[in-house]
């Protein structure tokens, strides 16, 4: 496919040692040739492909900067088009000046994600691989980066292609049975159809099962610490973060607002939320803090419910009523001051056992991180070689395919084959959309609009 010539700064905004201007399109080499001079090469066309050439960049006769120029010929480039990269010094003024000169000589400003969009449209990568690039760029933890790298490598694409192959073969066999029913063609049996559907459903189920874990490593787990005033919520936040982020005093009600910080637990971003202690109060500011606490609980993925080891109070029971429908763990703090509560009592009132800790003495705090991890992960990801589904679009398309296949299986013995094939084709269409083999232009535009300019 041929497009016009686009250009953008591909490195982050700011000061750095090197900045890169990327040019792509059928006239990219011609455009770059108008603004550079080389002491070694007479023209840009004399510079070998993939050779790092020292050049000088000019605006007409005005010298702008020295740079390294690398050119790539289609289809062997990131976009699949002719591409030129100009690596200049990294100041924003010089980068913007070079970009302006490139635009003045025949290119246009690239839209967000347009380079990767062209790579997709030119068959350099599929849609799921393109989406993996966003995750690699935005990775906040090593775990997400590793998973995104697997997706970029094509691990997810391979699994999707395997499901598609099963469905495509099944549809072909059914249509052959319909079209050549009067000839000597073996008709596919309902049992064979059911076996293929079950195989595809099992593969889809295994992928869907990874989504909650995938979502956790991508978006983070919103984890709210709740309890009555002075139970140790702020101290817990500070200990987990290993820094003094929240103010800690012996005065109940010190924390009056919601404080959020991110904790990395073995590659999973945990958004820790310290909240105001929940109690009846006449203090207007503290009351607002309590209201914000309850709102934080509503959106929580996980709640850390803290009580004290000297006994369960009426306030504890009232607080628990607001979190009992959430995923939660129970911490029993201040064991250094004595324990007047049993696991049986905790389990009877709150539905599960608690973890006894002493923040003041740093006792059993390693169990807290372990409990958080166990509460949020659907599976053990240590040594996990499979790719995790992290993208909601992929999950929704897999669910659609699952629904169509389930419908086909339910109707297998009561509907004719031509009706059955409609559900199978719809399932295949949903599967194809994951890798972009059958996707609307609007969806493509929406996906690539999430990229930054220059990628």
Curated annotation (Swiss-Prot):
The residues listed in the UniProt record as binding K(+), with positions renumbered to this chain, are 230, 249, 251, 254
Q: Identify the cofactor(s).
A: K(+)
Residue positions annotated to bind Mg(2+) are: 234, 255
Annotated GTP binding sites? 230-235, 249-255, 274-277
Q: Which residues bind (6S)-5-formyl-5,6,7,8-tetrahydrofolate?
A: 22, 85, 124, 455
Q: Note the CDD domains from the entry.
A: trmE, TrmE_N
Cellular component (GO) terms are: cytosol
Q: Where does the TrmE-type G domain lie?
A: 220-377
**Can you quote the record's cofactor note?**
Binds 1 potassium ion per subunit.
Describe the function of this protein: Exhibits a very high intrinsic GTPase hydrolysis rate. Involved in the addition of a carboxymethylaminomethyl (cmnm) group at the wobble position (U34) of certain tRNAs, forming tRNA-cmnm(5)s(2)U34.
Q: Which residues form a coiled coil?
A: none
User: In which compartments does the protein localize?
Assistant: Cytoplasm
Name this protein carries in UniProt = tRNA modification GTPase MnmE
Assembly and partners?
A: Homodimer. Heterotetramer of two MnmE and two MnmG subunits.
Q: Name one GO biological process term.
A: tRNA methylation
Q: What does the record give under GO molecular function?
A: GTP binding; GTPase activity; metal ion binding
The record, for Gene3D superfamilies, names:
P-loop containing nucleotide triphosphate hydrolases (3.40.50.300), Probable tRNA modification gtpase trme, domain 1 (3.30.1360.120), tRNA modification GTPase MnmE domain 2 (1.20.120.430)
**Which protein family is named in the record?**
Belongs to the TRAFAC class TrmE-Era-EngA-EngB-Septin-like GTPase superfamily. TrmE GTPase family.
Keywords attached to this Swiss-Prot or TrEMBL record, sorted alphabetically, are:
Cytoplasm, GTP-binding, Hydrolase, Magnesium, Metal-binding, Nucleotide-binding, Potassium, tRNA processing
Q: Which PROSITE patterns match?
A: G_TRME (PS51709)
Q: Which organism is it from?
A: Caldicellulosiruptor saccharolyticus (strain ATCC 43494 / DSM 8903 / Tp8T 6331)
EC number, as in UniProt: 3.6.-.-
For this protein, the record's Pfam families field holds: MMR_HSR1, MnmE_helical, TrmE_N
């Amino acid at each position: 496919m041929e497009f016009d010539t686009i250009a953008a700064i591909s490195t982050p905004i700011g000061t750095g040692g090197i900045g890169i201007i990327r040019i792509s399109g059928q006239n990219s080499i011609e455009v770059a040739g108008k603004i550079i001079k080389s002491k070694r090469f007479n023209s840009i066309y004399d510079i070998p492909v993939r050779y790092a050439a020292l050049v000088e960049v000019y605006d007409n006769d005005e010298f702008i900067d020295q740079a390294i120029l690398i050119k790539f010929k289609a289809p062997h480039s990131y976009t699949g088009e002719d591409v030129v990269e100009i690596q200049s010094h990294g100041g924003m003024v010089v980068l913007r000046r070079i970009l302006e000169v490139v635009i003045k000589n025949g290119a246009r400003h690239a839209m967000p994600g347009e380079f990767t969009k062209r790579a997709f449209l030119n068959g350099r990568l599929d849609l799921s691989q393109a989406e993996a690039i966003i995750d690699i760029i935005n990775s906040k933890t090593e775990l997400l980066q590793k998973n995104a790298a697997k997706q970029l490598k094509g691990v997810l694409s391979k699994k999707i292609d395997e499901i598609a192959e099963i469905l495509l073969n099944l549809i072909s066999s059914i249509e052959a049975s319909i079209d050549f029913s009067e000839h000597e063609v073996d008709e596919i049996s309902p049992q064979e159809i059911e076996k293929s559907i079950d195989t595809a459903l099992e593969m889809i189920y295994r992928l869907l099962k990874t989504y909650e874990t995938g979502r956790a490593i991508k978006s983070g787990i919103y984890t709210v610490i709740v309890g009555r005033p002075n139970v140790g919520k702020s101290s817990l936040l500070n200990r987990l973060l290993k820094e003094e982020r929240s103010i800690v005093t012996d005065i109940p009600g010190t924390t009056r607002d919601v404080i959020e910080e991110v904790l990395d637990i073995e590659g999973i971003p945990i958004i820790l939320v310290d909240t105001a202690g929940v109690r009846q109060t006449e203090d207007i500011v503290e009351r607002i803090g309590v209201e914000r606490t309850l709102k934080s609980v509503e959106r929580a993925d996980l709640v850390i419910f803290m009580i004290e080891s000297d006994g369960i109070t009426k306030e504890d029971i009232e607080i628990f009523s607001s979190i009992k429908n959430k995923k939660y763990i129970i911490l029993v703090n201040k064991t250094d001051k004595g324990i007047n509560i049993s696991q049986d009592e905790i389990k009877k009132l709150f539905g599960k056992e608690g973890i006894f800790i002493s923040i003041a003495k740093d006792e059993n705090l390693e169990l807290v991180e372990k409990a958080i991890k166990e509460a949020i992960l659907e599976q053990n990801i240590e040594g996990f070689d499979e790719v995790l589904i992290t993208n909601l679009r992929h999950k929704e398309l897999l669910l659609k395919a699952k629904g169509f296949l389930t419908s086909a299986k339910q109707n297998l013995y009561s509907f004719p084959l031509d009706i059955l094939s409609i559900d199978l084709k719809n399932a295949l269409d949903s599967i194809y959309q994951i890798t972009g083999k059958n996707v609307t232009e609007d969806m493509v535009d929406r996906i690539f609009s999430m990229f930054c300019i220059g990628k």
